[in-house]
A protein has these predicted regions:
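Conserved acetyl-CoA-binding loop-helix of GNAT-fold acetyltransferases
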Residues: 57-71, 93, 97, 183-188
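Conserved beta-strand in the GNAT
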Residues: 29-37, 45, 149, 160-161
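Conserved acetyl-CoA binding element of GNAT-fold acetyltransferases
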Residues: 35-37, 42-53, 83, 170-175
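Nudix hydrolase/Nudix homology domain
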Residues: 168-169, 240-286
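Conserved catalytic-core motifs of GNAT/GCN5-like acyltransferases
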Residues: 83, 99-117
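Acidic, metal-coordinating catalytic segment for phosphate/diphosphate chemistry
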Residues: 119-149
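Conserved GNAT acetyl-CoA-binding A-motif
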Residues: 73-85
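Unchanged
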Residues: 177-200, 208-261
Length: 286
């Protein structure tokens, strides 16, 4: 098995065969170990132990680059992955600097820790290229859940709320925006899928940040004006039975009685007027 080198960093082989491993040395001093494990179907997993701290992070990243290149170029793997406990941030950083993208979190059962899943494919752009660098940064950035909802009124000024299959409170029509989808486009799609109607999206009324609540992560709600229609408009709707039990025109009293806490608070702010373009909703009672 080959000795792998990068200037003063040397990987000396310990074990050959199906699961090779190396001793990591820097300027002749042992820094730790790194090994590959065959996971079948063209995939290998990599593990390393070079300590903690900034210097260890850089050492781990350099060792990873050598081993990953060896896995692709010499051993014929098409994917190398690592499963790193989420509290080992130095190792997660080393994986990213070493060219591995953050792909998600693997939950740990019982006393096992949750683990960050890192991965690199043989045809990913080089980590030192512009495309590769952006891809690595993008994979590690947090994402924000986005919800698009619409305020649709009838000729009496009542607002449309949906009775839902998955919670007792009624809510505004709309839903979660898909990755890469514009909020207004997502609202049109959601109403077409769930209510069977195609709407014209008007002005943005506000962006409403919702804090985490009842096991749901925080989210940003884009509330759009859907205008006014005749109350009979609901007769043309075809409801998606897995999510929508029914729809109701609601005055302020009905909203307070049946609406989800976030919807009640938001609609009250809309009715009060002078709504800011961005607002933060108060934390609802659990």
């Amino acid at each position: 098995m080959s000795t792998l080198t990068d200037d003063d960093l040397v990987l000396e082989p310990i074990a050959d065969g199906r699961d090779p491993s190396w001793t990591v040395t820097v300027t002749g001093e042992k820094a730790g170990t790194i090994d590959l494990r065959d996971e079948e179907h063209g995939t290998a997993s990599v593990r390393w132990d070079v300590g903690a701290g900034d210097q260890a992070t850089w050492t781990g990243a350099r060792a990873l680059r050598l081993v990953i290149d060896h896995a692709f170029d010499e051993l014929g793997y098409t994917r190398v992955e690592a499963r790193v406990p989420v509290d080992r941030m130095d190792d997660i950083r080393a994986g990213s600097i070493g060219g591995m993208r953050r792909e998600g979190i693997m939950r740990g059962a019982g006393n096992e820790p949750d683990r960050a899943l890192l991965g690199r494919l043989h045809d990913d752009p080089p980590a030192t290229s512009r495309e590769g660098f952006i891809a690595l940064l993008n994979a590690g950035l947090p994402t924000k859940r986005v919800i698009a909802q619409g305020r649709l009124l009838d000729e009496q000024g009542r607002v449309l709320l949906c009775r839902l299959t998955y919670k007792k409170e009624w809510d505004l029509p709309g839903g979660v925006v898909e990755v890469g989808e514009a909020p207004a486009v997502g609202l049109v799609r959601e109403l077409r899928e769930e209510l069977g109607v195609t709407v014209d999206v008007g002005d943005l009324l506000t962006v409403n940040w919702l804090p985490a609540w009842r096991g749901w992560d925080d989210a940003c709600v884009f509330l759009f004006d859907l205008g006014r229609v005749d109350a009979s408009y609901v007769d043309s709707m075809t409801l998606q039975p897995t999510e929508i039990l029914g729809v109701e025109w609601c005055d302020a009293g009905a909203v307070r009685e049946h609406g989800a806490a976030a919807a009640v608070e938001l609609l009250a702010a809309v009715d009060a007027g002078d709504l800011p373009s961005y607002r933060e909703a108060p934390r609802a009672p659990e």
